[in-house]
Amino acid sequence: MGLSTLEQKLTEMITAPVEALGYELVGIEFIRGRTSTLRIYIDSEDGINVDDCADVSHQVSAVLDVEDPITVAYNLEVSSPGLDRPMFTAEHYARFLGEEVTLVLRMAVQNRRKWQGVIKAVDGEMITVTVEGKDEVFALSNIQKANLVPHF
Protein backbone atom coordinates (compact mmCIF):
# COMPACT_ATOMS: atom_id res chain seq x y z
CA MET A 1 0.00 0.00 0.00
CA GLY A 2 1.19 3.48 -0.69
CA LEU A 3 1.90 5.23 2.58
CA SER A 4 1.95 9.00 2.74
CA THR A 5 5.30 10.71 3.28
CA LEU A 6 4.31 11.44 6.90
CA GLU A 7 3.29 7.82 7.49
CA GLN A 8 6.61 6.63 6.02
CA LYS A 9 8.55 9.01 8.27
CA LEU A 10 6.54 7.96 11.34
CA THR A 11 7.05 4.28 10.53
CA GLU A 12 10.81 4.81 10.32
CA MET A 13 10.82 6.67 13.65
CA ILE A 14 8.79 4.23 15.70
CA THR A 15 9.73 0.81 14.31
CA ALA A 16 12.89 0.43 16.42
CA PRO A 17 11.28 1.49 19.74
CA VAL A 18 8.31 -0.84 19.15
CA GLU A 19 10.57 -3.77 18.23
CA ALA A 20 12.84 -3.05 21.22
CA LEU A 21 9.82 -3.72 23.44
CA GLY A 22 9.35 -7.09 21.72
CA TYR A 23 6.44 -6.26 19.43
CA GLU A 24 5.90 -6.23 15.68
CA LEU A 25 4.83 -2.92 14.17
CA VAL A 26 2.02 -4.11 11.91
CA GLY A 27 1.38 -0.64 10.48
CA ILE A 28 0.21 2.87 11.13
CA GLU A 29 -2.56 5.14 9.91
CA PHE A 30 -2.66 8.91 10.24
CA ILE A 31 -6.24 10.10 9.90
CA ARG A 32 -6.60 13.85 9.44
CA GLY A 33 -9.67 15.54 10.81
CA ARG A 34 -10.88 18.11 13.31
CA THR A 35 -9.05 15.96 15.81
CA SER A 36 -6.47 13.94 13.89
CA THR A 37 -5.57 10.42 14.99
CA LEU A 38 -2.31 8.50 14.77
CA ARG A 39 -3.29 4.82 14.97
CA ILE A 40 -0.51 2.28 15.57
CA TYR A 41 -1.13 -1.45 15.18
CA ILE A 42 1.14 -3.85 17.08
CA ASP A 43 1.25 -7.61 17.42
CA SER A 44 3.27 -10.40 19.04
CA GLU A 45 3.27 -14.18 19.04
CA ASP A 46 1.53 -14.10 22.43
CA GLY A 47 -1.14 -11.63 21.33
CA ILE A 48 -1.67 -8.10 22.64
CA ASN A 49 -3.32 -6.85 25.82
CA VAL A 50 -4.06 -3.41 27.24
CA ASP A 51 -0.76 -3.26 29.16
CA ASP A 52 1.16 -3.95 25.94
CA CYS A 53 -0.65 -1.08 24.23
CA ALA A 54 0.08 1.24 27.17
CA ASP A 55 3.80 0.33 27.13
CA VAL A 56 4.09 1.04 23.42
CA SER A 57 2.06 4.24 23.75
CA HIS A 58 4.43 5.59 26.43
CA GLN A 59 7.54 4.67 24.42
CA VAL A 60 6.21 6.06 21.13
CA SER A 61 4.94 9.24 22.83
CA ALA A 62 8.44 9.92 24.13
CA VAL A 63 9.92 9.53 20.64
CA LEU A 64 7.25 11.70 19.03
CA ASP A 65 7.63 14.40 21.69
CA VAL A 66 11.35 14.69 20.90
CA GLU A 67 11.11 14.41 17.10
CA ASP A 68 7.78 16.31 16.81
CA PRO A 69 6.98 15.25 13.20
CA ILE A 70 3.25 16.04 13.38
CA THR A 71 2.37 19.71 13.18
CA VAL A 72 -1.31 19.42 14.17
CA ALA A 73 -3.01 18.28 17.37
CA TYR A 74 -3.70 14.54 17.33
CA ASN A 75 -4.71 11.59 19.47
CA LEU A 76 -2.42 8.57 19.71
CA GLU A 77 -4.09 5.15 19.61
CA VAL A 78 -2.20 1.87 20.00
CA SER A 79 -4.06 -1.38 19.42
CA SER A 80 -3.85 -4.94 18.19
CA PRO A 81 -4.75 -5.53 14.55
CA GLY A 82 -7.97 -7.28 15.62
CA LEU A 83 -9.95 -9.91 13.72
CA ASP A 84 -10.36 -7.64 10.69
CA ARG A 85 -6.60 -7.13 10.61
CA PRO A 86 -5.44 -4.30 8.34
CA MET A 87 -2.90 -5.22 5.67
CA PHE A 88 -0.04 -2.83 4.97
CA THR A 89 2.79 -4.71 3.24
CA ALA A 90 3.40 -7.44 0.66
CA GLU A 91 4.59 -9.61 3.56
CA HIS A 92 1.18 -9.29 5.23
CA TYR A 93 -0.59 -10.53 2.09
CA ALA A 94 1.91 -13.41 1.75
CA ARG A 95 1.38 -14.37 5.39
CA PHE A 96 -2.37 -14.60 4.86
CA LEU A 97 -2.50 -16.44 1.51
CA GLY A 98 -5.81 -18.26 1.22
CA GLU A 99 -7.60 -15.82 3.52
CA GLU A 100 -10.47 -13.54 2.50
CA VAL A 101 -9.71 -9.84 2.21
CA THR A 102 -11.61 -6.63 1.46
CA LEU A 103 -9.75 -4.06 -0.64
CA VAL A 104 -10.57 -0.39 -1.17
CA LEU A 105 -8.65 1.00 -4.14
CA ARG A 106 -7.34 4.51 -4.70
CA MET A 107 -8.32 4.33 -8.39
CA ALA A 108 -11.11 2.12 -9.71
CA VAL A 109 -10.35 -1.07 -11.61
CA GLN A 110 -13.16 -2.15 -13.94
CA ASN A 111 -15.24 0.73 -12.53
CA ARG A 112 -14.98 -0.65 -8.97
CA ARG A 113 -13.07 0.65 -5.98
CA LYS A 114 -14.20 -2.00 -3.47
CA TRP A 115 -13.29 -5.67 -3.95
CA GLN A 116 -13.61 -8.76 -1.76
CA GLY A 117 -12.01 -12.11 -2.43
CA VAL A 118 -9.38 -14.65 -1.41
CA ILE A 119 -5.67 -13.80 -1.52
CA LYS A 120 -4.18 -16.16 -4.11
CA ALA A 121 -0.66 -14.86 -4.76
CA VAL A 122 1.83 -12.10 -4.05
CA ASP A 123 4.41 -11.17 -6.67
CA GLY A 124 6.60 -8.22 -5.75
CA GLU A 125 4.32 -5.20 -5.57
CA MET A 126 1.30 -7.00 -7.08
CA ILE A 127 -1.28 -9.26 -5.45
CA THR A 128 -3.74 -11.67 -7.02
CA VAL A 129 -7.16 -12.00 -5.40
CA THR A 130 -9.77 -14.53 -6.50
CA VAL A 131 -13.08 -12.66 -6.74
CA GLU A 132 -16.20 -14.66 -7.59
CA GLY A 133 -14.09 -17.38 -9.22
CA LYS A 134 -11.97 -14.99 -11.31
CA ASP A 135 -8.39 -13.91 -10.56
CA GLU A 136 -7.91 -10.15 -10.32
CA VAL A 137 -4.46 -8.53 -10.04
CA PHE A 138 -3.94 -5.34 -8.03
CA ALA A 139 -0.91 -3.10 -7.52
CA LEU A 140 -0.17 -2.61 -3.82
CA SER A 141 0.35 1.10 -4.55
CA ASN A 142 -3.32 1.31 -5.67
CA ILE A 143 -4.67 -0.20 -2.45
CA GLN A 144 -5.93 2.51 -0.12
CA LYS A 145 -7.16 0.14 2.57
CA ALA A 146 -7.19 -3.62 3.02
CA ASN A 147 -8.58 -5.76 5.83
CA LEU A 148 -8.96 -9.46 6.47
CA VAL A 149 -12.57 -10.63 6.57
CA PRO A 150 -13.22 -12.42 9.88
CA HIS A 151 -15.19 -15.67 9.76
CA PHE A 152 -16.96 -16.97 12.84
From Swiss-Prot:
Pfam family, one: DUF150_C
BP GO terms, sorted: ribosomal small subunit assembly; translation
GO cellular component: cytosol
Coiled-coil annotated spans: none
Domain of life: Bacteria
UniProt xrefs under InterPro entries: Ribosome_maturation_RimP (IPR003728), RimP_C (IPR028998), RimP_C_sf (IPR036847), RimP_N (IPR028989), RimP_N_sf (IPR035956)
Annotated CDD domains: YlxS_C (cd01734)
Subcellular location: Cytoplasm
Alphabetical UniProt keywords: Cytoplasm, Ribosome biogenesis
Primary residence: cytoplasm
Family: Belongs to the RimP family.
Role of this protein: Required for maturation of 30S ribosomal subunits.
NCBIfam families: PRK00092.1-1 (NF000927)
Record-given protein name: Ribosome maturation factor RimP
Upper taxonomic lineage: Bacteria, Pseudomonadati, Pseudomonadota, Gammaproteobacteria, Enterobacterales
Gene: rimP
